[in-house]
Amino acid sequence: MSAAEAQRAVGILVVIAPADGAEKVSPAQVVAGLPLVQRIALAGKAAGYAEGLVGDRPEQIPARVVLLPRNVVPQPAWLRSLLEGALERDCLVVDSSMTMVVETADPSLVIKAAARAPSAAALHEELRARYAQGPWPFETSGRFVLTATEDVRRAETWLLRSLIKQREGFMSRHFERRISLGLTRRLVRTSITPNAMTAVSAAIGLAGAPFFLSSEPRWQLAGALLFLTHSILDGCDGEIARLKFLSSRRGAILDFWGDNLVHVAVFACIGIGTTWATASFWPLAAAAVAVVSTVASAAVMFRRTVDDRASAGSTSSARLLDALASRDFIYLLLVLSAFGKAAWFLVATAFGTPAFLALALWLDYRHGRVR
């Protein structure tokens, strides 16, 4: 069966008994804030599998049945690949975790076999007698196999590392993410929601902006540290949402515009504070340029950022745009603020944000949309 035909097949995800040796892993075992069986069900839903089983499913509708041992922690993208990848009709494939996939015109036979089989091995034997077995054609990197409860922490680490986005800056990837992922590991065990974390992060960032009204290094540094704290905590909302399957477009929009509101507030306060300190007009003009360019850039970049997509094409310009969109600039502000020179950062921003906007618009023109 071709990949296109596979996409038209109904996907059915069935949780089965674990492979021999993993029986002690309870289906109620909590992994990153969710019971294991609930995590599997939500991952299947996110991957596009049917939410329920219909007893009188018409036989002419093909179905791809994925039989997943309950000790396997799956990524939605991996489950989606099992659903959409090419697979011959009535061919059984099995991986080392005893995950089984079969494409069939009568899925009820497979489902009934799974219901009565006492173990994954017994189910495998029964299905192998009915279907020809072929080699496993899919990747295995998208799932983590629990063999004992001691594996839970490693499984959580594996899940957390998968949350790093495509467009991470160097400092974000190697410093901020380490902190935010450590916080998220603990936060997912609580009832805090992604939107609540977005509000906390934005509040801290906005609280830091007024410190830049002063020209004193100590106050500017305090503001920069709060700005950095905002940036670190800003990663937690999306991490919680993806780990607990709470992602929503509304939440992504709130996060995106909350970030940009903080940036606008910081740039504006630097401009106002520098104007007070120097009795000059140019800081306000520079801040106005930075604010307008930031808002315009946000409008251009909105869809790609909210959907976490790479820039269209693979040109050096597209890669440069992704690099400039990162928030590593915060560390420059941190250093300059330690010496009371936040105004220097404002000057750089007044030149940099229009250049970023021009590059985004140029790529938008060349590729239709920057996505």
PLM feature spans:
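Membrane-embedded alpha-helical segments that form the functional core of polytopic membrane enzymes
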Residues: 194-250
